[in-house]
Amino acid sequence: MGAAYLGVPCTVKNRPALDAAYLPFAPWRDAYLKEAHRPVRIAVERQEGQVAVFDTRLRGVTDPADLRFLERTVKLLLWSVGGWRVRICGCDGLTRRLADIYGSHGSRAFDASLMETVFRRPFTLESVEERDFPAARSGARKIGGHLGGCRIGFDAGGSDRKVSAVINGEMVYAEEVVWHPKTQPD
């Protein structure tokens, strides 16, 4: 089934019955990228100088579709890798508009504020030249192994559900109940 969003035609295989106007981002993004040839680089800096770099393309006509694609891509990166500083290379005008969107009165102010809270740094979104674009940098971090305090675990499986609780690494509660949610009516 054909659809168009911001002048980019795309195909959607299944339309939801309760919201036929809904257009998932993925088919639109795929169609958009078929028309995109202008390289753009996005760097998201997070703790300890770690930088995630994402290379993509824009159509390069500075239209609402370019802005929407860039905005969605930055939001995806913020929510998937996190960061307090976003640097974009290859589209100065769109980056300025995006900085307003992520500003204190913009539609993505919540995202910027959350990143400031998480990383304890002012959130910035800026345009940079290629010579100033940072290289990707990551570091290994040990995760898990924290046994102090109270923890609870829950697993709702297809045939049973399990609950367990520990205090300072010692199990204080465990329960497993046979449960068949797939065969139960809604």
Predicted regions, residues:
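Generic recognition of cysteine residues
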Residues: 10, 89-91, 150
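Intrinsically disordered, low-structural-confidence terminal and linker regions
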Residues: 1-26
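Short glycine-rich, Thr/Ser-proximal phosphate-binding strand/loop in the N-terminal lobe
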Residues: 19, 28-32, 38-63, 156-186
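Flexible, charged surface loops at secondary-structure boundaries
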Residues: 33-36, 76-83, 145-147
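Low-complexity, highly charged intrinsically disordered N-terminal segments
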Residues: 60-112
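Short glycine-aspartate micro-motif
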Residues: 85-87, 149-155
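Non-catalytic propeptide/linker segments at domain boundaries
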Residues: 98-149
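Short, solvent-exposed secondary-structure boundary motifs
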Residues: 22-23, 68-69, 143-144
